Amino acid sequence: MISPMLSKPVEELPSGKNYIYEIKLDGQRTIAEAGKKRLLLSTRGFQNVTGRYPELQGLKQCFKGEDAIFDGEIVALEKGIPSFQLLQRRMSLRDARAVTPLLETDPVLYYVFDLLHYNGRSLFRTPLMERKSLLKKIFITGEHVKLLPFFDSKEKILQQARKFGYEGVVAKRRDSFYLPGQRTSLWVKQKFQLIDSFVIGGWLE
């Protein structure tokens, strides 16, 4: 299992051509180790949660190649509206029999934003934008598996984030290596105060 790279909180995001920007989703950070016949989903605390999200088994068919390790966020939606309370209900389940009835009523999505290994090769020492480029080439969108978009413009993503009421925005240096378990200034996050409910499905998809 791999410990995900973390972002430092800041009051204001950095600007400039050295950064890209992504929406910060309020979900469960999850590393996905996928092969054509196997899938392992693990949390920041190295907990195996594969059995809690059987609808994400489709991830095994969502990329070209033999094997891959992804970094992303599991999010629960209720009629297009993200609900962390709904996700917590799924997070707490251990029994597969309890999960099954919720697959139709309370499904989850996995938003992928990084590629850590591919076809047996580690990408930790590969710059972020090269990882993003390879991820885009091999990724196949699935019913419950999506690619998280990123922006070059801080102003544009901040406008969208506030419009749709997202939790925040993450800025990442284009040349950043992937540093498992480390919280560095290469990735920084700015959180917003959220008051109302909001719809995210249309914009992210």
Each model region followed by its residue ranges:
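Catalytic cores of nucleic-acid ligases and guanylyltransferases
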Residues: M1-E205
